[in-house]
Amino acid sequence: MAKRIIYNEQARRALERGIDILAESVAVTLGPKGRNVVLEKKFGAPQIINDGVTIAKEIELEDHIENTGVALIRQAASKTNDAAGDGTTTATVLAHAMVKAGLKNVAAGANAITLKKGIDKATDFLVEKIKDHSKPISDSNAIAQCGTIAAGNDEEVGKMIADAMDKVGKEGVISLEEGKSMTTELEVTEGMRFDKGYISPYFATDTERMEAVLDEPYILLTDKKIGLVQDLVPVLEQVAKTGKPLLIIAEDIEKEALATLVVNRLRGVLNVAAVKAPGFGDRRKAMLEDMAVLTNGQLITEDAGLKLENATLDMLGTSRRVTINKDTSTIVAEGNEVAVNARCEQIKKQMDETDSTYDKEKLQERLAKLSGGVAVVKVGAATETEMKDKKLRLEDAINATKAAVEEGIVPGGGTTLAHLAPALEDWSSTNLSGEELIGANIVEAALTSPLMRIAENAGANGAVVAENVKSKPVNDGYNAATGEYVDMLSAGIVDPAKVTRSGLQNAASIAGMVLTTECIVADLPEKKDSSPAGGGMGGDFDY
């Protein structure tokens, strides 16, 4: 396919046009009085949302060159979303402000490479300053405040997430599901829960609720298919003598063995239940090993030279209680902290070593199931459109609270960046010179842009608000919801330091790339073929 090649100023201006379009679409959502954006969908109802990165992903322009600008700034939003899970709109607004100011300097003859060096040095200085300003989270109240701000000032959501974090701990997983009612509810599962239910409904001990509840059972874990009942007989006899229930978790249990277990259960010889092992392949084996650690048992696998027919009672795991329904099983174990902690450390090391986001997610789930448990937020809403918007806000809130626990909090509402502008000005004027200093000044000018946009979305004069905030003490900022200047930490208007930091770093990175662009190679728009002639017609000709 033929390409179009554009150089110098023309190339940078084309990128700028794309960046302007995306930044404006996303910036309208910033702050407590930010507006919504409606996304048209090819199928189904339009989506009304307030989430920067989702809007950015939807924007595609007809002009290939302008679209390249959109893709570049979308990357700043996506990278911030990947790192911190929130702050995507702030990153977009910052990147846009840096690009606008930088392009003016490049057009006036400044050296783009030296400007980029100045931008990078200023960013490194600011990252250190953000670390100094951040305050560690001390109580669930601060977590609730973080969640409230990230969810678009929804206090109920903030409190719910703080409760969930309290119950499942820092390593726990908080997942979102679409609820069946109008209200948003929180459900916390203690212990390890996995998505496999009983193999046969005849294992249910509570026929009204169709649940199998086993108190203080033995747990047999194996990664093989159980086909012959003879393999199970030695274990069944040993467990029957103790009078305790037995849970079997295996790859599968085939008809003959299953029938024997069901008959024993119905006759009251042995209270037994069987469940298929969760996951596939290596992941299934890893989850079974996790369960073995949790229940203080052994995974009976031929890889370790263990056979089912030779299994003894001391190879079986134990737990306080097991609850199984048709879809899920929950094991509540206790008293094996040392081994569980060692296993958790091992999983954390694997998380540090892997580059795959998917693997990280799965390892995080395993870690949560072992260490804390799982909290499920069931999102309730009147319509599907509202449900989708709520779900995105909740996702942001969960990510923001996790980021806050990791790196602490800073005053929100664009306040921290605005207060850092004078500090950057002092530092850069003594440590930088020439065009590097101009690069630092570009960053300094951009630092107030999120605050200005928040104020403008609330109907105030952004430039006036920014100057007022700069002259006030470090923690004081502009509360756009009420139009007052307040102590942001006392008012509960906080941002995770990680969100502020990663937004700034990604914005500076993209701005540097745009400023140092000298040539763009893009596809030429395809010419549409003229429509073919219909029967008795002469194509696109006028006769």
From Swiss-Prot:
InterPro entries: Chaperonin_Cpn60_CS (IPR018370), Cpn60/GroEL (IPR001844), Cpn60/GroEL/TCP-1 (IPR002423), GroEL-like_apical_dom_sf (IPR027409), GROEL-like_equatorial_sf (IPR027413), TCP-1-like_intermed_sf (IPR027410)
First-tier enzyme category under EC: isomerase
Binding, ATP: 29-32, 86-90, 413, 479-481, 495
Cellular component aspect of the GO annotation: cytoplasm
Primary location group: cytoplasm
Pfam family, one: Cpn60_TCP1
Record's keyword terms, sorted: ATP-binding, Chaperone, Cytoplasm, Isomerase, Nucleotide-binding
Gene3D superfamilies, per database record: GroEL, GroEL-like equatorial domain, TCP-1-like chaperonin intermediate domain
Family as reported in the entry's similarity comment: Belongs to the chaperonin (HSP60) family.
Protein name (Swiss-Prot/TrEMBL): Chaperonin GroEL 2
Organism name: Prochlorococcus marinus (strain NATL1A)
Higher taxonomy: Bacteria, Bacillati, Cyanobacteriota, Cyanophyceae, Synechococcales
